[in-house]
A protein has these predicted regions:
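A detector for small-residue-rich transmembrane helices and their helix-helix packing motifs
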Residues: 1-167
Length: 167
């Protein structure tokens, strides 16, 4: 799990990655996996496997780092874990991509994603024990990476005119 004294003082930097694979209970794990199953494949199809993995891991590690620094600055000694920062990164990247595609990508639209992100952040703020800094920073990291990594597919119009004398 992510615990800033272990990361900073004991130099256990691997915790920034491994904490994204640790969950605090079956409902925590199932909630994250359901969200990831619903939206993750859309982002993978839009970006490809490698870029998707970059977004997921960078948002996971980045949000863990931001959360650890935030806890250290507030002098809090909380333990953090779960894939939520990485998943919020997927949501952020997907939102940018959907917006770039005029608000629609496959079965998703920008309104759905903004409502999901808004309600999730609201739930986190209203609930105890939620790492809101990881959620928000994961979303921002994902949105930035989505903007950097995504390139819209451009379809060239086929030339339907035939030159005289050709088949």
């Amino acid at each position: 799990a992510s615990f800033w004294p272990a990361i900073i003082e004991e130099h256990e930097y691997y915790r920034l990655l491994t904490c994204t694979f640790i969950h605090f209970g079956i409902s925590h794990l199932l909630n994250n996996m359901l969200v990831l199953a619903y939206i993750g494949d859309n982002l993978e199809r839009a970006l490809g496997k490698i870029k998707y993995l970059i977004v997921y891991l960078a948002a996971g590690v980045g949000s863990s780092a931001v959360s650890a620094v935030w806890s250290m600055m507030k002098d809090e000694y909380s333990v953090s874990g779960g894939a939520s920062g990485a998943i919020f990164g997927v949501v952020g990247a997907l939102l940018v991509i959907v917006i770039r595609n005029r608000g629609q990508l496959e079965d998703l639209n920008s309104r759905q994603l903004m409502l999901f992100a808004g309600f999730s952040i609201y739930h986190g703020v209203m609930s105890a024990g939620i790492d809101n800094m990881a959620h928000i920073s994961g979303f921002v990291i994902g949105a930035l990476l989505g903007g950097l990594l995504y390139r819209r597919k451009r379809y060239r119009k086929q030339n339907t005119k035939r030159a005289a004398g050709t088949w």
